[in-house]
């Protein structure tokens, strides 16, 4: 779904003479998304871990670079963890191979992060700044959405709930103050 939407937007921009702004494979976009990492450290100066969903990689790359630079400037360290759906995990494969790798994706409820190939710009930044990337299953994502709704009264789309899914499923065993970035509230009705 994401690839189709991306191509449709590029085609539309070309036909209409509009400006196409890439959603993640653009340094300016990545830097803009990095402000999320800065805000986290501004508000929680003792945070030790940040968990972020990874699709194309823009948000994760921006958060990782900005948070690590700010923490270092303050004489601290912060670890950044990325999470992908096991149905669309190009970063896991690409990081293992050390190069951009396109993977086959299968349908996932986390369609907002269902990309088949990492962005070139974010991949280089993630390779250097993300401490670990894990995957979560469809059932783990669904459980996280339910937990967020029942306990936190938050409607979070599947793509944004993967970080909580990783924690609940025990994919990340972290010590210290941890922040999970919850992004997106786009939920299709049941």
Please give the residue ranges for each predicted region.
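PLP-dependent amino-acid enzyme catalytic core
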Residues: 1-190
């Amino acid at each position: 779904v994401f690839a189709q939407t991306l191509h449709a937007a590029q085609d539309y921009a070309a036909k209409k003479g509009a400006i196409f702004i890439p959603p993640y494979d653009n340094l300016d976009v990545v830097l803009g998304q990095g402000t999320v990492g800065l805000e986290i450290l501004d508000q929680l100066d003792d945070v030790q871990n940040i968990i972020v969903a990874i699709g194309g990689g823009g948000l994760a790359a921006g958060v990782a670079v900005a948070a690590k630079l700010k923490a270092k400037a303050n004489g601290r360290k912060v670890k950044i963890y990325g999470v992908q759906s096991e149905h669309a995990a190009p970063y896991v494969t690409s990081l293992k191979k050390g190069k951009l790798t396109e993977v086959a994706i299968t349908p996932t409820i986390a369609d907002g992060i269902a990309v088949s190939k990492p962005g070139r710009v974010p991949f280089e930044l993630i390779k250097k700044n993300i401490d670990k990337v894990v995957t979560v299953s469809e059932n783990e994502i669904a459980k996280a959405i339910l937990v967020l709704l029942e306990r936190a009264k938050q409607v979070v789309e599947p793509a944004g709930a993967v970080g909580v899914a990783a924690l609940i499923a025990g994919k990340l065993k972290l010590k210290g103050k941890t922040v999970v970035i919850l992004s997106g509230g786009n939920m299709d009705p049941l």
